[in-house]
């Protein structure tokens, strides 16, 4: 299901993206954290080294959940309803239990996310088309461009 328009059922939305230039290649994550009341909006883009696109996608979700927990505190996190938005259909289907995970490294990320998820009231994963995830994608590309410029 890909429902681009939704009523606010969640306290926070975490838009995530991970990307690599080459697969594997130089990689980065982009994360946008927003509260439903508009009081919180944080943007992050970080270079994460040489890895695969799928690995970067998972690292973005892990980063986003950890960062949100840090921002709002453990007690508030325990009651918070979180929507994680990704343009990776593979990631969304794996996290929602529709696709098996073969790669051992991705299995480790899945387990880390499973353990992080229990720190929140509810975590839901939703796929959106790439054009609806431009902010997180922009953060990925900015981090990759910054790293590339360091090397020149």
Q: Where are the regions a protein language model picked out?
A:
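RNase H catalytic domain
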Residues: 19-23, 62-151
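Short, conserved alpha-helix that lines the donor NDP-sugar binding/gating region
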Residues: 57, 61
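Intrinsically disordered, low-complexity segments enriched in small/polar residues
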Residues: 1, 8-10, 42-45, 97, ...
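RNase H-like nuclease fold core
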Residues: 2-55, 66-68
């Amino acid at each position: 299901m890909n429902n681009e328009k939704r009523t606010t059922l969640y306290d926070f939305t975490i838009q995530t993206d991970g990307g690599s230039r080459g697969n594997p290649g130089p990689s980065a994550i982009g994360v946008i954290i927003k509260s439903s009341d508009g009081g919180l909006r944080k943007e992050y883009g970080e270079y994460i080294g040489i890895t695969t696109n799928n690995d970067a996608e998972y690292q973005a979700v892990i980063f986003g959940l950890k960062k949100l927990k840090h921002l709002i505190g453990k007690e508030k996190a325990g009651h918070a309803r979180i929507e994680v938005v990704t343009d990776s259909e593979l990631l969304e289907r794996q996290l929602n239990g529709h696709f098996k995970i073969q790669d051992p490294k991705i299995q480790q990320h899945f387990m880390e996310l499973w353990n992080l998820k229990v720190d929140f009231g509810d975590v839901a994963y939703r796929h959106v088309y790439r054009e609806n995830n431009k902010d997180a994608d922009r953060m990925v590309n900015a981090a990759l461009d910054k790293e590339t410029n360091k090397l020149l």
